Swiss-Prot record:
PANTHER family in the cross-refs: RBR FAMILY RING FINGER AND IBR DOMAIN-CONTAINING
Effect of residue 371 to A: Disrupts the hydrophobic network. Abolishes E3 ubiquitin-protein ligase activity
ZnF RING-type span: 186-236, 344-375
EC number of the protein: 2.3.2.31
Organism, as annotated: Homo sapiens (Human)
Known outcome of mutating residue 492 to A: Hyperactive 'open' mutant that displays enhanced E3 ubiquitin-protein ligase activity
GO biological process assignments: PKR/eIFalpha signaling; protein ubiquitination; ubiquitin-dependent protein catabolic process
Family recorded in the similarity comment: Belongs to the RBR family. Ariadne subfamily.
Domain notes: Members of the RBR family are atypical E3 ligases. They interact with the E2 conjugating enzyme UBE2L3 and function like HECT-type E3 enzymes: they bind E2s via the first RING-type zinc finger, but require an obligate trans-thiolation step during the ubiquitin transfer, requiring a conserved active site Cys residue in the second RING-type zinc finger. The active site probably forms a thioester intermediate with ubiquitin taken from the active-site cysteine of the E2 before ultimately transferring it to a Lys residue on the substrate. The Ariadne domain inhibits activity by masking the second RING-type zinc finger that contains the active site.
Keyword Acetylation: yes
Protein name: E3 ubiquitin-protein ligase ARIH1
Family annotation (CDD domains): BRcat_RBR_HHARI-like, Rcat_RBR_HHARI-like, RING-HC_RBR_HHARI
Residue intervals of every IBR-type zinc finger in the record: 256-317
Amino acid sequence: MDSDEGYNYEFDEDEECSEEDSGAEEEEDEDDDEPDDDTLDLGEVELVEPGLGVGGERDGLLCGETGGGGGSALGPGGGGGGGGGGGGGGPGHEQEEDYRYEVLTAEQILQHMVECIREVNEVIQNPATITRILLSHFNWDKEKLMERYFDGNLEKLFAECHVINPSKKSRTRQMNTRSSAQDMPCQICYLNYPNSYFTGLECGHKFCMQCWSEYLTTKIMEEGMGQTISCPAHGCDILVDDNTVMRLITDSKVKLKYQHLITNSFVECNRLLKWCPAPDCHHVVKVQYPDAKPVRCKCGRQFCFNCGENWHDPVKCKWLKKWIKKCDDDSETSNWIAANTKECPKCHVTIEKDGGCNHMVCRNQNCKAEFCWVCLGPWEPHGSAWYNCNRYNEDDAKAARDAQERSRAALQRYLFYCNRYMNHMQSLRFEHKLYAQVKQKMEEMQQHNMSWIEVQFLKKAVDVLCQCRATLMYTYVFAFYLKKNNQSIIFENNQADLENATEVLSGYLERDISQDSLQDIKQKVQDKYRYCESRRRVLLQHVHEGYEKDLWEYIED
């Protein structure tokens, strides 16, 4: 079966990867035509594919760790790594300068994997695809694999990893005695084919190549499985190796998806690597040590290396995660709930009033409480007063109303911060579109005897505006969980000052430019964006100082 030309990584340059000859060979010779055991075949297709592949230029390959802490350069216990640039711009630029990282392509990650497998194989000397499965089982931790490999119980190790001990390979081959010309039924489709059209794993289960191809394609494309595809035979848990997958699949898109699944498991197990979260971007950021710091991908996306969200200074990852979950749960229905429902005074389930009678019965099967809609007190004392309530000041009703008011106050507080958070998010989206308008304004200015350098202040102003919007957006998340104290008052004053200056700068940039106002606008814009930069820096420095001195107290949601 012919294969596409492309990447083929070999451990020994003198060895070549041979292809399977499905012609009139005897069954016992069939396995000898598979790729050499010292070759990891994961790349016989282009690594760039629209929607699946990677974009951007190539980096020089860095031999770094597959983990952190103090250890070797392989596995999650790995030590230091290759250096790199710190990126720039965007919120938290002052932190970016000291945080070194590299942006790698998917091809380079694949090469990292091959290098990791090669290093392990220099010791254990197994087929490359078997070593890859063993490493995957131990989350690419080389030390753990080595410890288990040499503890004297290899059979148990291979059984746990769902592979057959390579030393038994020759004995398995000798069990095959059927002639290659003899027809036999496939146990999946039950069609008869010559024996030469069948293939299988070391477990001895063989199926026709068409069924193998469809089975692997379904597992990869529909179920998203890569490193855990098992033999299709019922009850067999032996895993399919990489060479078998690449040999039996002809569709380059399926091969590419398989590559991505394998490399994704490598990245996910490595705390020094993280995929860029931008849509359709398949770059990986590699750092020297994991931390909540901003990193910038080649595609332009800046994100927090710790949590993978957009860079969110000044709020910490923990609180941003809680906020996002709260917004997902509450934002769409909170306004309607506040206007149209009340809580049962007994079980606190939310209840909607759908009739004129004030006599309410909770539908919760474990509650069934009867209460008054007006005062939220027990219904029994109301007697026959079906359509009015004269028990407003009774203690039980007052306690229920107090609990209701606290709940409503908490909701109103959430809506206050959520609305401002969303407003700045929407403004940030609009102001990203300002770059096109600013480009046109810069061209107009150059037509009025201003040089290219003289009009760069407009682009700088939009950069600062977007930075301030992003910072302000996340200050409302920080403020939502912040307890009131003297430091929080200073923070709110800094926030208000930055917010006012940002709105003024936004107004300047959206104003029409005429020849008479060019110099006047330039001076105003430059003064204002410099002031915004200064106030943003003051706000962030104050928050970071509070983190260092443990000045902030939080409201547990």
